[in-house]
Amino acid sequence: MGNCCVTPEGSGRGRKKQQQEQKQKQKEPKQQQQQQKKGKKPNPFSIEYNRSSAPSGHRLVVLREPTGRDIAARYELGGELGRGEFGVTYLCTERETGDAYACKSISKKKLRTAVDIEDVRREVDIMRHLPKHPNIVTLRDTYEDDNAVHLVMELCEGGELFDRIVARGHYTERAAALVTRTIVEVVQMCHKHGVMHRDLKPENFLFANKKETAALKAIDFGLSVFFTPGERFTEIVGSPYYMAPEVLKRNYGPEVDVWSAGVILYILLCGVPPFWAETEQGVAQAIIRSVIDFKRDPWPRVSDNAKDLVKGMLNPDPRRRLNAQQVLDHPWLQNIKKAPNVNLGETVKARLQQFSVMNKFKKHALRVIAEHLSVEEVAGIKDMFEKMDLNKDNMINFDELKLGLHKLGHQMADADVQILMDAADVDGNGSLDYGEFVALSVHLRKIGNDEHLHKAFAYFDRNQSGYIEIDELRESLADDLGANHEEVINAIIRDVDTDKDGKISYDEFAAMMKAGTDWRKASRQYSRERFTSLSLKLQKDGSLQLTTTQ
C-alpha cells in the first residue's frame, strides 16, 4: 500500500490527503467542480458512482493496491458466516495449503456514495497500517473485480464475547478484568499508531477459536479513522449505547475509544448498559447527563477498585478521562490475580445473554432491512427534486421543502423541517442543491414509512398470522441460542410483548426495534444524518451545550 502503511505524521498525512483530494476531484462531475470554484462544499454522500448515467466504460475502483482481481484463483469460497450492511462474510479455503480464512465480500452495488467507498478503502488502509497484534484480526489479501471487493482475513471461530461469558458456568470480576485489559490494549495500540477506532462494542470482538485460552480479537475497523495529535473530528458515527458525549457535541478525538471501552466494562460487570432509554433521543440525553448507577445488583458486591476504573473511563470531560495507558496502569488491572473471583451471580449472566440475544434479534431484522436497501431506492429522486424546485433555480429553499414534504404526506412542524434542512445543508447556504437533496431523500424514505420494518416483521412472521409467535421466534434465533434457550426466548417475549398476549404484534416489534438503538443503521449514511440531526435538535432545546475541548 506504499505510504498507507506509514505511521501518519502531520506533513506526510497532508500530502496523502492532497493526493486523495486531487484524484477525487478528477472523478467529480463538472457541476460539483464548478461549485468548488465558487467556494461551495459538495455533499460527499451525494457523489454517486453507481448511477446509470455514468460515462460509458466507467469502472468503479475502490482499492488502491489490491492483491489481484481473481480471488477464485487462490481461494475457494464456502458457506456464509455472517452478513452486514455492505456485504457477506464467507468461509474461504486457500487452495494450495487448505488453510481456512474468512472472506468479507462487499458488493459494489451497495457502495453508492463517495463516503461508502472511502469507508471501505480506509478500512483496508488501516488494517494494513496497523502492526501485527495478537488481539487484532489479520488482513491477509485483498481482491477487487467488477462486482465486489473481497477482504481475506484471519478466521475467528470462537464466537462472540458475551456468548463465551454466558457459556461459562462461573463468571467473575476477574474474568471481566481480563477482557477489559485486552480491549484497552487494542485501543492503546491503535492510538499509538494514529488510529481512532470509533466503534468499539462487544459485537466487534470474536474469540480466535473455541479453546479456553483463545485470544480475543478486534475484527471490524469499518468506522476507524487516521488522526494526528490535537486533531478534532465532527462526524457523528458509532453505536448509540457506546457513543461518548463529545461525539454528540461533534467535537472529539481518540478519547472516545476509552469511553466506549468503559461502557463495555460497565456491561461486563452488571449486564446492562450504563446509559439507556426507550428512544435514541433518550439515550443521547442519558449519555450527556453521564449519571452512572452503582446501586443496582450486583454493584454492592463489586470492588471499589472496579467502580473507580469505571468512573475514570466514563468521565464526561475527555480532558479528565483516563487515557489507554492510565487505564492499563490502574490498580484493578495491574492486580488482576487479586481481583475478586467471586461469582457475580446468575442475574448478570442472564442479563448479558438477554442483551446479546436481543441484539441478535435486531441484527436478524437489520439483515432483512439491509437486503431491501437496493440501488433502486434512489430512483425517481431527480423527478421529485424538479417538482419541488418551484422557481426552477436548481435549489430548494425552506418553503419549497416544506410544501414538497406536505404533498408527499410528511406532516412536519416548521422546527422539524428546519432540523432536516440543517442536517442536509452541508454548505450552509440555506438551500439544498441536488446533491444535498439526494442524501435527504434517502433519509426521508426511512422516516416517512416503515416499509423496511414491515419486511423484517414479515420475515419472522412465517405463517403470516400478523404476529411473531414463540415457535417462530425460537426457529428464527435457533443458531444464536445456547443451552438455556427457553429462558432467553421467554425473556424476549416478556420484554417485547407489552400487552401480555403471548405473542409479538407489529407495533410491539417496531417499538422494540426503535427502543434505545437506531434500527436504521442498516444504512450507515442514514445513521450519520440521523445522529447529526439529533445533535442539532438537542442543541436547540438546550439539552446539548457545545463546548470547545482543547
Swiss-Prot record:
Annotated PANTHER family: SERINE/THREONINE-PROTEIN KINASE
PROSITE patterns per record: EF_HAND_1, EF_HAND_2, PROTEIN_KINASE_ATP, PROTEIN_KINASE_DOM, PROTEIN_KINASE_ST
Source taxon at top rank: Eukaryota
The enzyme's E.C. designation: 2.7.11.1
Topology relative to the membrane: Lipid-anchor
Record-listed Ca(2+) 3 binding positions: D461, N463, S465, Y467, E472
GO cellular component: cytoplasm; nucleus; plasma membrane
Enzyme class, first EC level, given as a word: transferase
Domain Protein kinase: 75-333
SUPFAM superfamilies: EF-hand, Protein kinase-like (PK-like)
Assigned protein family: Belongs to the protein kinase superfamily. Ser/Thr protein kinase family. CDPK subfamily.
Activity regulation statement: Activated by calcium. Autophosphorylation may play an important role in the regulation of the kinase activity.
Entries under CDD domains matching the protein: EFh, STKc_CAMK
Residue stretches making up the EF-hand domain: 376-411, 412-447, 448-483, 484-519
Stated name of the protein: Calcium-dependent protein kinase 20
Gene induction: By N-acetylchitooligosaccharide elicitor. Induced by UV-C.
GO biological process: intracellular signal transduction
Catalytic residues (UniProt): D199 (proton acceptor)
Organism phylogeny: Eukaryota, Viridiplantae, Streptophyta, Embryophyta, Tracheophyta
Keywords noted in UniProt: ATP-binding, Calcium, Kinase, Lipoprotein, Membrane, Metal-binding, Myristate, Nucleotide-binding, Repeat, Serine/threonine-protein kinase, Transferase
Catalysed reaction equations from the record: L-seryl-[protein] + ATP = O-phospho-L-seryl-[protein] + ADP + H(+); L-threonyl-[protein] + ATP = O-phospho-L-threonyl-[protein] + ADP + H(+)
Lipid modification (N-myristoyl glycine), residues: G2
Basic and acidic residues composition bias: residue spans: 18-30
Tissue-by-tissue expression: Expressed in roots and leaf blades.
Ligand binding (Ca(2+) 4): D497, D499, D501, K503, E508
